[in-house]
Amino acid sequence: MSQPFDASAFLATCSGRPGVYRMFDAEARLLYVGKAKNLKKRLASYFRKTGLAPKTAALVGRIAQVETTITANETEALLLEQTLIKEWRPPYNILLRDDKSYPYVFLSDGEFPRLGIHRGAKKAKGRYFGPYPSAGAIRESLSLLQKAFSVRQCEDSYYANRTRPCLQYQIKRCKGPCVGLVTPEEYAEDVRHSVMFLEGRSQQLGNELNAEMEKAAMALNFEKAAELRDQIALLRRVQDQQYMEGGSGDVDVVAAFVNPGGACVHLISVRGGRVLGSKNFFPQVGIEEEVAEVMAAFLSQYYLGNAERELPGELIVNVVHEDFDAITEAVQTLRGRELSISHRVRGTRARWQQLAVTNAEQALNARLANRQHMAARFEALAQVLDLDEVPQRLECYDISHSSGEATVASCVVFGPEGPLKSDYRRFNIEGVTAGDDYAAMHQALQRRYGRIKDGEGKLPDVLLVDGGKGQLNMARDVMQELGFGDLTLLGVAKGVTRKAGFETLYLNDVAHEFTLKGDSPALHLIQQIRDEAHRFAITGHRARRGKARRTSSLEDVAGVGPKRRRDLLKHFGGLQELNRASIDEIAKAPGISKKLAESIYASLHSE
């Protein structure tokens, strides 16, 4: 048995300088990372005999070792603390769950550039606008730009293989650059207007469009004037929706709200006086449950944890914390930019602040209510399946394909708080007979649980398989083969009517068949997970199928680049006509030699 931590001996040698401390348990697992102006004073507060909050007392009870790192000042300590939290994600720290990269609007290079959504490393050549608080905010901006200026948003592979305009051209949301229906000069002007909007210069853009409209009207070019009039009206409507009264500059309005059981931080992004969007964050609450502690932890992780994240000039917050000065100094050190944090604001800015507080409160209350509802369903499922404990992790699998084409298996994961989307997985199924769902499911389970056997990932408490007796038997064989024979399996088969509420369930083997009443909370949970697995499989299948159908077999031919491929398709009128052509006919196309024609013909008829 390990010796209890000797706090007195540790504190006797502890420095009183600024720094970072790390607390470990008996198995050397990092429990908590903190910073302090005075390490000795801060650490002594953990080991007093009375007055500790329950979570803090639980943390102290697990401490077996404490390590400290002395820093030159509090700002340096804050930066080191955030680095360690991001790397190790200690269980007793406040943690942002949503740490994925934020989306940008991407404008590609080229004569006819495209607009699209981009996440991750900025490797592609072009311009990036953002980041936006959510993909929904970007889609809203892209939809507006498509209606107003008709800059293409299709993938380059799709664009390069067009021989006639697509539906977007027919509904006047694209000008058909793929088939030469717009000049490079006219398209460049539409791109320039789109860039002005994305840069927040909407007022200047509106004035410019007004001047162009008057000029077109004076020249009796009424069709062009009407087009500009519609663009101006659309722009004004968006300005009315997005501009905050009295707003200007770049501001993030951040409000934190804490209730027993959780916390929510609501962020409203305002750029150039225009609202780009808003987003809710639900951080994992550690030992600090005060709203000011949640706010300080959020600001540190959000603005210091990602060097690429766009930094506003000002933050408006609903609470104050002693760390705010250190945070602004750390931003200056790390980002080379000044940041002000305001709390006491008036007028319009006070209304922004209150709006963020209201949104945070409502979002947290809704989340807690949903969590209680979900927890009740998990308890009902435990009773139905006669489990000793309420399950904490459910996995469900489904298969999707179109007559065997582009087969995809999905894995969705649920816990008592709802879907765990970061744990979702898709599997592109290869090497099985087209349309063989059993073989596809077998491959997906082998891949998933083979990794779990190797130490990657977590084993669920219950495995749901959509498909009935055959799929359940196959899943049981895979689990026994991999050494997970004790795992609870639940097969879900549609009833005779194939309507929701009439599902037939199989527990562990086909002999244990049963049904549940339509109003059963356990059945509702099963249906929810099954439907989510189905949705996730279908979206993955459609994406894979669409990519395969957009990819031309010409793309694999050496010497046939995008321009030559496009010219070749235009010459023959499409891929179908090119497929019918002989080698001699292909060689007659402009720029195609006999040798290249043979390569093209071989590629088109390789199957």
From Swiss-Prot:
A Pfam entry, by short name: GIY-YIG
Record-linked SUPFAM superfamilies: C-terminal UvrC-binding domain of UvrB (SSF46600), GIY-YIG endonuclease (SSF82771), RuvA domain 2-like (SSF47781)
Residue ranges occupied by any UVR domain in the UniProt entry: 203-238
GO cellular component: cytoplasm; excinuclease repair complex
The encoding gene: uvrC
CDD domains on file: GIY-YIG_UvrC_Cho
Assembly, per entry: Interacts with UvrB in an incision complex.
Stated family: Belongs to the UvrC family.
Name of the protein: UvrABC system protein C
Gene Ontology molecular function terms on file: DNA binding; excinuclease ABC activity
